Amino acid sequence: MQKLENSVPFGREMKDAYFNFAKNYTPLNHGSFGTFPKSVRDYQRDLQDLAEARPDTFLRYTYPDLLEKSRCAVAPLLSVSMDEVVFVPNATTGVNTVLRNLVYQKGDVIIHFSTIYGACEKTIDSLCETEHIERVCVHIDYPEEDEDIISKFINTVEDLKNDGKTVKLAMFDTVLTFPGARFPWEAMVETCKTQQILSLIDGAHGVGHVDLTHLGRVSPDFFTSNCYKWLFCQGVDKN
């Protein structure tokens, strides 16, 4: 794999030396599709060649070993055990996997914030059509203080309880898609524990972007992320 030389300055020189962008292309929207260095591209192609050389051997024996090594590599970034790490196609798939495998009862509510990613909101809407579940949106309008966000959430929970509802789960982000602000997810997890509410974190812009080495200690019920955005992994099929 290509070795990163300290002599290459950060910025345009590094982009041209280590990434696959066209010379006249300046990427301003890394968050949507991500990218990966040339060294990752080269290793990916080596694996493709290995798989094509001995398909049966690769899928039965080589792939499971590589998968376990990849899980072992990600686990320390989150300070969790390898047994808690599972790969999914993307964060939205992870959200769907969690939400569609919970058991709901009449009166259950899912709380989310107005900054929720669109696909996740549509998933909740879909559930509301097929399950005994309601969704409640907590409106926030940035700039907003973290303490005010937590206070709005608690007030919403109390209002729902007084109305005879049960808040089953709260869904929130690590870093918001719009605006690109860091969400107080640690405080939200702690609040959910106090309120006996399941916490689901959409960390699509989490791993590789912000420090998550305390995730194991914070211990949300569910956390899902994307490695292809900020961890420089190959993931999104742009074809």
State the predicted function of each range.
Residues 1-239:
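Pyridoxal 5′-phosphate
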